[in-house]
Swiss-Prot record:
The chain crosses the membrane at residues 235-255, 270-290. The lineage of its organism: Bacteria, Pseudomonadati, Pseudomonadota, Gammaproteobacteria, Pseudomonadales. Belongs to the glycosyltransferase 2 family. It comes from Pseudomonas savastanoi pv. phaseolicola (strain 1448A / Race 6) (Pseudomonas syringae pv. phaseolicola (strain 1448A / Race 6)). CDD domains: DPM1_like_bac (cd04187). Catalyzes the transfer of 4-deoxy-4-formamido-L-arabinose from UDP to undecaprenyl phosphate. The modified arabinose is attached to lipid A and is required for resistance to polymyxin and cationic antimicrobial peptides. It is found in: Cell inner membrane. Keywords: Antibiotic resistance, Cell inner membrane, Cell membrane, Glycosyltransferase, Lipid A biosynthesis, Lipid biosynthesis, Lipid metabolism, Lipopolysaccharide biosynthesis, Membrane, Transferase, Transmembrane, Transmembrane helix. This is Undecaprenyl-phosphate 4-deoxy-4-formamido-L-arabinose transferase.
Length: 337
């Protein structure tokens, strides 16, 4: 592993209804970046906020000599799509992603950059003393284990978005045009050298988590279907096992019928229906998984943009780019500073 020279660092932060957190976020992130020995930019992507987050970001970007770049999406597309929009607009040799809720400290940015300089393609983080509720922690642990086994990359906390990516990894992710994207897993599929560090995890001071139960369900299906075909293989194994059990159960019923006679066969009707419902339920689960894969294939084949950038505002106090969509080649979407 060789050292990686860094001249410019980009911080990409997706923002959705974070009006109360933004002043502190902007102050702390800029202060942390000033400890870097590199030029930097802070790209904040408003993901269709319903409060005045977009206006706050634009005001910050319009300051004289401001390090902030405001990327305004026309509506809400989700956290990972917003980060991809930020990737298209940033120009750093190393790109740091950070959530806007301040649960992960921006003060960790210099440490991640230092590790990236050592030659790591991806620097992940693990939340110590996690402050989320139990109903968020346990599903996260299960998902982390499942992802590790399906991808073969042993990283402990895929849910923590405070991460550093080398430019080549970012460009590789931008070249992937699928709509259902989970960035940490996608990045690790291209990375050769990865590492993890422990970071603090604070309680959310303002607002609630933007991941509703339905969004968590959608995220789970994205994780299952976007990076592996293992569930389809499991369906084949389960289907074969159910068919074998069905044959064995039918043989058992015939034997019991011969031993106990016709009256017993009549009494066993409800058992037969119970087994039938189990098999039918298994079939519907399999059909649902197949539907998820086919639905995502359909979305990718249509090749619609993953997001639509309404405008990009930089420190020149003018709108640099308007009406940019993600269907354009990533390199064509970049805007000169």
């Amino acid at each position: 592993m060789r050292p990686y020279p860094i001249k410019f660092v980009s911080i990409v932060i997706p923002v959705y209804n974070e009006r109360q957190s933004l002043p502190e976020l902007l102050r702390r992130t800029e202060a942390a970046c000033k400890h870097l020995n590199h030029r930097f930019e802070i790209v904040l992507v408003d993901d269709g906020s319903r409060d005045d987050s977009a206006e706050i970001l634009q005001q910050a970007a319009e300051r004289s000599a401001s390090p902030f770049v405001a990327v305004i999406l026309n509506r809400n597309y989700g956290q990972h799509a917003a980060i991809m929009a930020g990737f298209e607009q940033c120009k750093g040799d190393v790109v740091i992603t950070l959530d806007a809720d301040l649960q992960n400290p921006p003060e960790e940015i210099p440490r991640l950059v230092a590790l990236a300089e050592q030659g790591y393609d991806v620097v992940g983080t693990v939340r110590s003393n996690r402050q989320d509720s139990a109903w968020r922690r346990w599903p996260s642990k299960i998902i982390n284990v499942a992802v590790q086994r399906s991808t073969g990359v042993a990283m402990s906390d895929y849910g923590c978005m405070l991460r550093a990516y080398r430019r080549t990894i970012v460009d590789a992710m931008l070249a992937c045009r699928e709509r259902s994207t989970f960035i940490p897993i996608l990045a690790n599929s291209f990375a050769r050298h990865t590492t993890e560090v422990l970071v603090d995890h604070a309680e959310r001071e303002h607002g609630d988590s933007k991941y509703s139960p339905m969004r968590l369900v959608n995220l789970m299906f994205d994780l299952i279907t976007c990076m592996t075909t293992t569930p389809l293989r499991l369906l084949s194994i389960i289907g074969f096992s159910m068919a074998l059990l069905g044959v064995l159960f039918a043989a058992l019923l015939i034997i019991l019928r011969l031993i106990f006679g016709a009256p017993w066969a009549g009494d066993g009707t409800f058992v037969l229906f119970a087994v039938l419902f189990v098999f039918t339920g298994g079939q519907f689960i399999g059909m649902g998984l197949l539907g998820e894969y086919l639905g995502r294939m359909y979305s990718d084949v249509r090749a619609r943009p993953r997001f639509f950038i309404e405008k990009v505002v930089r420190s020149s106090s003018e709108v640099v780019s308007e009406s940019v969509d993600s269907s354009v080649t990533p390199y064509m979407n970049k805007v000169a500073p």
